[in-house]
From Swiss-Prot:
Entry note: cofactor: Binds 1 [4Fe-4S] cluster. The cluster is coordinated with 3 cysteines and an exchangeable S-adenosyl-L-methionine.
Keyword Cytoplasm (UniProt): no
Native source species: Anaeromyxobacter sp. (strain Fw109-5)
Protein name (database record): Biotin synthase
Gene Ontology MF terms in the entry: 2 iron, 2 sulfur cluster binding; 4 iron, 4 sulfur cluster binding; biotin synthase activity; iron ion binding
Pathway: Cofactor biosynthesis; biotin biosynthesis; biotin from 7,8-diaminononanoate: step 2/2
Subunit structure: Homodimer.
Length: 368
């Protein structure tokens, strides 16, 4: 989703956990305005006025043996209505990446459901897709394959993988309320293995699953300690048939305060506001940039609809910000024409549309 974290100017100092615990409760009135303005100033000082977009493909969906309570792809929740299909061919992944690239995505992630990629044939297909992404597109290849083991990371990096994504999802102190089929330490080891292989790291979480504001700060502190380059922030969009179907949504003000605190705690990191922004922020989605975000998604999520590329790009430009275009080596401009939008919608509606074509969102082994 992003490049390596930036180097901080000498006058920008990350806030402490103690200050973060206070600020994250500034969810209204002048206190929230001041918090957003402070985060906006840090974003501009460190990251300028550019906003990056990213895309993913839901390359393998459903029948996941993990029991993440937010995820409609879990086999533990048969009442959830998520698409189920095996790993798509490498050519289909590349075709989706090309659509996302034309929409402005700088990075494209291959996401698979399941604990990890266990079959040699699947790993070989993903390696092939990564090689083709490097050869045929300008997007930077990323993968989100669950609790991947280090030997697989070695192979994927050799194929050209540049980023690895694995969300922690929530604070360690709240994790048992979200998932019991794998441990927090297993997640941390996955991230550390990717770091040992020199891959750029992408890890964040989903807010609004019942955790306290202090636990949101706890998650941010863990991410900061890991030295994550890119932090995707998602807000729960309860999926029918999952244990979290009836969880009360957090307010737009709580979402914005959390984004601002994450920015102030991690001024050098790239912060992307991803899944759930439509549901939780509504008409205030544009404020994610004032809250400190410097990236977002374009298009649909893994198992639910999002905004089209034109709407997202217009939102960026209306805030006086610039899209950080794909590094194609040639002049690039977003094609917001009706034919281009029609092509996007056509791809989303054809058989692959059930596979989230093209999509962006908050993967962790396919959870979204």
């Amino acid at each position: 989703m992003c490049e390596t974290a930036r180097t901080l100017p000498p006058d920008i100092v990350p806030i402490t956990v103690e200050e973060a615990r206070t600020l994250i409760r500034h969810t209204g009135g002048p206190a929230l305005d001041a918090l957003l303005d402070r985060a906006d100033a840090v974003r501009r000082a460190v990251h300028g006025d550019e906003v990056a977009l990213c895309g993913i493909t839901n390359a393998k969906s459903g029948r996941c043996p993990e029991n993440c309570g937010f995820c409609s792809q879990s086999a533990h929740f048969p009442g959830a209505d998520a698409p189920v299909y095996p790993l798509v061919p490498a050519e289909e992944m590349v075709a989706q990446a090309k659509v996302a690239e034309r929409a402005g995505a700088r990075e494209f992630s291959i996401v698979t459901s399941g604990t990890r990629v266990a079959k040699e044939s699947e790993l070989a297909t993903i390696e092939e897709a990564v090689r083709k992404l490097r050869a045929e597109t300008a997007v930077e290849p990323c993968a989100s394959l669950g609790l991947v083991r280090e030997p697989e990371l070695v192979r994927l990096k050799a194929a050209g993988l540049m980023h690895y994504h694995h969300n922690l999802e929530t604070a360690r102190s709240f994790f048992e309320n979200v998932c019991t089929t794998h441990t927090y330490d297993e997640q941390l080891e996955t991230i550390r293995a990717a770091k040992r292989q020199g891959l750029k790291l992408c890890s964040g979480g989903i807010l609004g699953m019942g955790e306290t504001p202090e636990q949101r700060v706890e998650l941010a502190a863990t991410i900061r300690e890991l030295g994550i380059d890119c932090v995707p922030m998602n807000f729960l969009n309860p999926r029918p048939g999952t244990p979290m179907e009836h969880v009360q949504a957090i307010t737009a003000e709580e979402c914005l305060a959390a984004v601002a605190v994450f920015r102030l705690m991690m001024p050098a990191a790239h912060i992307f506001v991803m899944g759930g922004r439509e549901v939780n922020l509504g008409g205030r989605q544009h404020l994610i940039f004032r809250a400190g975000a410097n990236g977002t998604m374009v298009g649909n999520y893994l198992t639910s609809a999002g905004r089209g590329p034109g709407e997202t790009v217009r939102m960026v430009e209306e805030q006086g910000l610039r899209l950080r275009a794909p590094d194609t080596g040639r002049e690039w401009a977003f094609d917001g024409s009706a034919p281009a939008e029609a092509e996007w919608n056509r791809r989303a509606a054809e058989p692959g549309g059930k596979r989230g074509l093209p999509v962006v969102g908050p993967p962790r082994g396919g959870c979204a």
